[in-house]
């Protein structure tokens, strides 16, 4: 995906420097659109475009600023029920969560040093109240539902043709080999590296962040 490097500003660290949306752009390597922001000091950056943000609108990053579309704030300053995207996992690391087209997280509770968020996957977890997030939902709400009119549309976003393991040679895949249309010869499908596929959970056990997850993803 280095071919489609976008240089998108996920950190949004221009604190208290107003910016104006110049235009919205289609980005071939992303499922969401981006927009060009020109800040008051003359710097130009590209950010993810939330639904409803149009050329001429202003955006701002700050601690106690208006709750407006496209503004970037600390989680502790967001009211309950706010839809957000580009959410940090740890303070100062840049947005990591809810960045795909049509996705958003929701602020559902505040307690102590943590804010409780419902993520796009359905997972409910604690995140530090000192993490930053951007207000609004990512545009392209029909992401994943549009019918493709040519194979090249998948190639634009980095998806290449997928070959089934059962039609490969046994040296290339555990499902391979046999005469004609033969079964895989196993009780359960596996990955090319021999691990159980289709339903097996791959998250490592005993991770430190397990204590922060209230409800696992659906």
From Swiss-Prot:
<dbReference type="InterPro" id="IPR012340">
    <property type="entry name" value="NA-bd_OB-fold"/>
</dbReference>
<dbReference type="GO" id="GO:0016740">
    <property type="term" value="F:transferase activity"/>
</dbReference>
<protein>
    <recommendedName>
        <fullName>Large ribosomal subunit protein uL2c</fullName>
    </recommendedName>
</protein>
<dbReference type="InterPro" id="IPR008991">
    <property type="entry name" value="Translation_prot_SH3-like_sf"/>
</dbReference>
<dbReference type="GO" id="GO:0009507">
    <property type="term" value="C:chloroplast"/>
</dbReference>
<comment type="similarity">
    <text>Belongs to the universal ribosomal protein uL2 family.</text>
</comment>
<dbReference type="Pfam" id="PF03947">
    <property type="entry name" value="Ribosomal_L2_C"/>
</dbReference>
<keyword id="KW-0687">Ribonucleoprotein</keyword>
<dbReference type="InterPro" id="IPR002171">
    <property type="entry name" value="Ribosomal_uL2"/>
</dbReference>
<dbReference type="GO" id="GO:0005762">
    <property type="term" value="C:mitochondrial large ribosomal subunit"/>
</dbReference>
<dbReference type="GO" id="GO:0003735">
    <property type="term" value="F:structural constituent of ribosome"/>
</dbReference>
<keyword id="KW-0689">Ribosomal protein</keyword>
<dbReference type="Pfam" id="PF00181">
    <property type="entry name" value="Ribosomal_L2"/>
</dbReference>
<keyword id="KW-0934">Plastid</keyword>
<dbReference type="InterPro" id="IPR022671">
    <property type="entry name" value="Ribosomal_uL2_CS"/>
</dbReference>
<comment type="subunit">
    <text>Part of the 50S ribosomal subunit.</text>
</comment>
<dbReference type="InterPro" id="IPR014722">
    <property type="entry name" value="Rib_uL2_dom2"/>
</dbReference>
<dbReference type="InterPro" id="IPR005880">
    <property type="entry name" value="Ribosomal_uL2_bac/org-type"/>
</dbReference>
<keyword id="KW-0150">Chloroplast</keyword>
<dbReference type="GO" id="GO:0032543">
    <property type="term" value="P:mitochondrial translation"/>
</dbReference>
<dbReference type="InterPro" id="IPR014726">
    <property type="entry name" value="Ribosomal_uL2_dom3"/>
</dbReference>
<dbReference type="InterPro" id="IPR022669">
    <property type="entry name" value="Ribosomal_uL2_C"/>
</dbReference>
<feature type="region of interest" description="Disordered">
    <location>
        <begin position="165"/>
        <end position="192"/>
    </location>
</feature>
<dbReference type="InterPro" id="IPR022666">
    <property type="entry name" value="Ribosomal_uL2_RNA-bd_dom"/>
</dbReference>
<dbReference type="GO" id="GO:0003723">
    <property type="term" value="F:RNA binding"/>
</dbReference>
């Amino acid at each position: 995906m280095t071919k489609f490097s976008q240089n998108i500003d996920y950190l949004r660290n221009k604190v208290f420097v107003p910016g104006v949306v110049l235009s919205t752009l289609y980005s071939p390597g992303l499922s969401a659109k981006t927009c060009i922001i020109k800040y008051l000091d003359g710097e130009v950056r590209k950010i993810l475009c939330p639904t409803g943000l149009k050329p001429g609108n202003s955006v701002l990053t700050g601690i106690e600023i208006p709750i407006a579309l496209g503004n970037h704030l600390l989680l502790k300053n967001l009211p309950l029920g706010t839809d957000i995207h580009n959410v940090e996992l740890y303070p100062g690391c840049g947005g990591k969560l809810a960045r795909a087209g049509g996705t958003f997280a929701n602020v559902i509770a505040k307690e102590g040093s943590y804010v409780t968020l419902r993520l796009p996957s359905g997972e409910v977890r604690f995140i530090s109240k000192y993490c930053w997030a951007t207000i609004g939902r990512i545009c392209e709400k029909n992401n994943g539902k549009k019918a493709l009119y040519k194979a090249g549309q998948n190639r634009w976003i980095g998806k290449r043709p997928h070959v089934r393991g059962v039609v490969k040679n046994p040296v290339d895949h555990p499902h391979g080999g046999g005469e004609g249309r033969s079964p895989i010869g196993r009780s359960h499908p596996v990955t090319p590296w021999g691990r159980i596929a289709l339903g097996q959970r791959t998250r490592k056990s005993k991770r430190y962040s397990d204590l922060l997850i209230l409800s696992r993803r659906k």
